[in-house]
Amino acid sequence: GRPNEGLRIDPVEQARRIREAEQNVKFLHDHGVKHVFANVGTIFGCPVQGEVLIERAYEFVDRTFSIGFDEIEHSDTEGTATPDRVYEYFSNVLEKYPDRNMHSFHVHDVYGMGMTAYYAAAQAGVSTFDCSMGGIGGQVANIVDGVPVKGAGAYYYDNCRTGLVETCDFVTM
């Protein structure tokens, strides 16, 4: 892996890595792997760049499927999505890629909006959701020299609010 490098690589290197991903996905399919899964993270917000334009997220979805992945886990890893943006995003994605088996949704419940984000995604047609027993989990790991370290900076929040959506809450909904 190349943690946190994506923001600093030039377009030539990006193109090389995309070709490499295409070759790897093809290799996996050719050797019996039936379902190759990718994650498109920071759809709605990025700890480094701030709010993400929805058009940019659509570009990543298109690119990921064009590489040959079978499913995307769409992720709000910053927990900043509002229900209206989630509904708009998934309505548009599912219009273009209507097979529900191609999509799942992962939310960090930083601001207590995870359940409303899941509800909005369900209303748009998403049927696979990533939940966590007891809300265990938190923010995306901060990596320094390949080692996870404690996060620092304005985008790290109160540890009491950084878990994932709890499975029992999701079932109750």
Outline where the language-model segments fall.
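Catalytic cores and adjacent flexible loops of soluble metabolic enzymes
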Residues: 1-173
